[in-house]
């Protein structure tokens, strides 16, 4: 049975809502207890894609509040708290207990609560005489957001900026690495697996992998081993492979335009936590949810947009035919057939029963069709207005050819599109072109200025490419470059060639992404010059024998792929396609520090440009985070 992160996290949440009691086979508690749920903003975002109000009601939650809102006492009712272990949350809990807001307090922290906070909680509740109110304290290890069965985010915003900030010192970098490794640890605890870890040598990926390896080793030696429950999985199947990369491994895929439905909805309509709003011609915006409960989204989110439009039309026509068929059978339309029986005849009664059963299904189908018609209409309007299809094609051609005709380049920059569309296109030109023509670059900059685009991100990529070319030349004989705190090295690490030496070299003939191709090679477990230098870490093996590639045992049927500095729906889709066409790996879970669209990643590049003095003041730039 394949790993399913959404299912595992949902099970943990349900158990928490039922006061951490064992559940019966139906997924509910043996004894129903009505309770109140208190959460912070972060944990609200964890719950949002997993549960709806009806699910909370099913598990006895009658009221739910944000922890930072003023609340009235509700006596004789237990309260379930689900919050991050922060100083402010801790003080609020102590204050709530001292006021006896609720009968009992069941405290659930999204990650492991530090010992000093635990002592502070004990001291605070003792001082106020409310210690008996605290029934239980649990570390839930749920500090991540699951968006689909195989997609998660640590919801750690602006990690790319923080990791690549030229002013960041060793202390700041180590704090970021700690946060990322702790988030990944939560994911592995929830899945109940201890993976084999692979990553490029040098750079953020190796730092996270090494720290995570140590965390897992320490935990496996502790008395309260959280991975014993996963033993059944491990005895039946091979352990999964965890592949860790950082965004600079393949920067282009995070910036480029894409014409497939899921990335397009995320990029153009701002899909967040599986929800989006679409402005119609009249009235307020309509809110929609897109997740695995939507059959059309599940079946068609990987298709190119024109194919989605055709599929919507097909589904609508099928719906109309089915409605007409129902009308015929019930005498509601012309040419109705009653099979020679009267209204109370057995056959017609059966027709009526079948019709009644089919009505809810037809109604639900119509809702789904209407939803995607609204979304597709909004997308089409933006595609036409911004020429997104043209940007997508030109960027793809640039990546394959390693450049673009100057006339075509300038026409795109002076044509339709938002400032951000043109900025992304210009950065893709920089990344994909092996030999930069100075006069051409100046013409691109002039076109961006004419469009009144903030060129900080463009200047940043140009500067780094220039610095990196000389940096690579002076260290060409270096077998390993691992001084992460040096900012230029910190930015590129092992992945220099992936960003600046012509990304077309990393693409196979079918335009397979570099990450996908690398994961495919890693899961096969065969000798391969492209990955032979990758670190191999096995937390279950003796430390002395854990670093060499000779210990790799492939192939791997399960993989977890993690991107530091921001993932995207393009990579996610590519990795899911890998499981469909490749014989080895059957299931891939994809995660990232946050899920970003192209504009959001370029905003982070722009902020780095400003920090390097390549644009306006840093304070003038605000980031709209991913999820």
UniProtKB/Swiss-Prot annotation:
One Gene Ontology term from the biological process aspect of the record: vesicle-mediated transport
Residue ranges that the Swiss-Prot or TrEMBL entry lists as coiled coil: none
Keywords: Protein transport, Transport
Positions of transmembrane segments: none
Composition-biased stretches (Basic and acidic residues): 527-541
Pfam families attached to this UniProt entry: Sec1 (PF00995)
SUPFAM superfamilies: Sec1/munc18-like (SM) proteins
GO CC annotation, single: mitochondrion
InterPro entries xref list: Sec-1-like_dom1, Sec-1-like_dom3a, Sec1-like, Sec1-like_dom2, Sec1-like_sf
Region (Disordered): 526-551
Main function: May be involved in the early secretory pathway.
PANTHER family for the chain: VESICLE PROTEIN SORTING-ASSOCIATED
Record-stated family: Belongs to the STXBP/unc-18/SEC1 family.
Protein name, as recorded: SEC1 family transport protein SLY1
Gene behind the chain: SLY1
